[in-house]
Amino acid sequence: KELTPEIKKIVDKVNAMDLEEQKKLLREYGAIEKPEKIEKDKMPELKNSKNVVVRFAPNPNGAISFGHCRPALWNWFIKGHYTGKYLLRFDDTDPQVKPPIKEAYSWFKDDLKWLGIKPSKIIIQSKRLKKYYKYAQELINIGGAYVCTCNSEKKRELLHKSIKCPCVDKYQTDRWKWMFDGTYKAGEAVLRIKTDINAPNPALRDWAAFRIVSENKHPLDSKSVVWPLLNFASAIDDHDFKVTHIVRGVDLQVSDD
């Protein structure tokens, strides 16, 4: 507001000049270059774009945020571009640290509808625990998973030094059952996926897949005590529901490994 009179004075002065004077000043001060027309970014062509299936997978432990809206819409645009399927999957398997809110399931559905997003299918992970247990048992049967009872400090040292865990060679079927029947308490045992103990990234070495929960605050399932961690449940669901492409932040890039 304060600059308006000054700007008007300068404009009037320039307008009072003849064309040659204006050109001379333009040469002295340099012309303002007109920016080149920038084409809008086009969606990159995806590999294996036949029968595209994408998923938006929030934890319903609160209302939808702008951070949620971005991947929700990205996936929706991909689904629309390739005439694929869009899955809304509630990653609600943390009933203790980040327990879901019962009303939040509806909040997400309503807000996605407001954004113009219509999921092809809705999946609730907490209702698929038996499926996750089944896959876990199959992995145990083939030696692909084991129940670890090492304390966190000892386990950290073993993984850091790429040393085989002594729990690997123990009879796993009983140890897995003991996670459910109360023999093991929360923090005393976890089921781990057996991987390459020499993997360059320590986070990928024998990672935890299931843990025992002592304080279950889940609004849909308050009785279960053994719960899958995100990476395990997510991998199973991506496989079962034939997810073809995943849009996620750099912070989750390690999941690709």
Over which residues does each language-model region extend?
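Active-site cores that bind ATP or allylic diphosphates and position pyrophosphate for catalysis
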Residues: 138-257
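N-terminal Rossmann-like or analogous alpha/beta NTP/dinucleotide-binding catalytic cores
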Residues: 1-166, 251-257
